[in-house]
C-alpha cells in the first residue's frame, strides 16, 4: 500500500486528481469506479479544471459508481446520480450513457444488483476504483460486519452512517435506511484502488486500514490484501500513523 500525506484537503484533492488524470491519459478507455460524499468533491473540481484547460478528455471513459440510496430517483437532489451529475458529469465531456449508478427505484433490487455486477464484468472490470472512508470503516455502503465475498447487494445502513449523512437532508428522518452497494468482493477485484481521506475524524480508520488487524468489523482493513492500493490523506487524517 502506497501512502501519500498532504498538507491539507486542498492539496489532497489535487494530488488525487493528478493520480487519476495520469491513469486516464495512459488509458483513454479506462473504467473508473467513482465515489460520492464530501471527500471527493475537491478532487472532482480539480478534474473539471483540468478538462476545461484541455488537459483531459473523458469522451471514451466509462464510470461505475459504488452505491445509491434505495427509494430515491436519479432526479432527487440527494441521490448519488444527482450528486455525480452536479459535481462532475455535467461539467466534462463524458458520455452520460457510459456513466452507471445503481437504480434506487428498481422494482426488483436483487435483479438490479445482479445486472450491475454483470455490467462490470462485461466491461472487463474496474481499472481504477476511488474510495472514501466512512468514520466507522465502511467503504461504499459495506458496513461493519458484512462478509467480504458479497457482490452488489441491498444493505441496511448503520445508525452511525445515517447520522453522518443527515447533514445532507432536511431531517434525519428523511435519510434513506437502505442502499444498493457494490460489495467488498467487487471492490477488491478492481485493478487499482485509490483511497482518499481528510480530517481528524478519519484518523482512527486510516490507522486501522494501514496497520490494523484485518476484520469485517472495519471493512477498510480488507484493502490491506489488495495488490495495488494508493492512500492519499491530509495531515489531520494521518496524525495517528507512526
From Swiss-Prot:
Its EC number is 3.5.99.6. The keyword Hydrolase applies. The keyword Amino-acid biosynthesis does not apply. GO terms for cellular component: cytoplasm. Gene3D superfamilies: 3.40.50.1360. Pfam families: Glucosamine_iso (PF01182). InterPro entries: Glc/Gal-6P_isomerase, Glucosamine6P_isomerase, Glucosamine6P_isomerase_CS, NagB/RpiA_transferase-like. Keywords: Carbohydrate metabolism, Hydrolase. It catalyses: alpha-D-glucosamine 6-phosphate + H2O = beta-D-fructose 6-phosphate + NH4(+). The active site is at 67 (proton acceptor), 136 (for ring-opening step), 138 (proton acceptor), 143 (for ring-opening step). It is an enzyme of class 3 (hydrolase). GO terms for molecular function: glucosamine-6-phosphate deaminase activity; identical protein binding. One of its GO terms (biological process) is N-acetylglucosamine catabolic process. Pathway: Amino-sugar metabolism; N-acetylneuraminate degradation; D-fructose 6-phosphate from N-acetylneuraminate: step 5/5. Belongs to the glucosamine/galactosamine-6-phosphate isomerase family. NagB subfamily. Catalyzes the reversible isomerization-deamination of glucosamine 6-phosphate (GlcN6P) to form fructose 6-phosphate (Fru6P) and ammonium ion. This is Glucosamine-6-phosphate deaminase. It comes from Clostridium perfringens (strain ATCC 13124 / DSM 756 / JCM 1290 / NCIMB 6125 / NCTC 8237 / Type A). The gene is nagB.
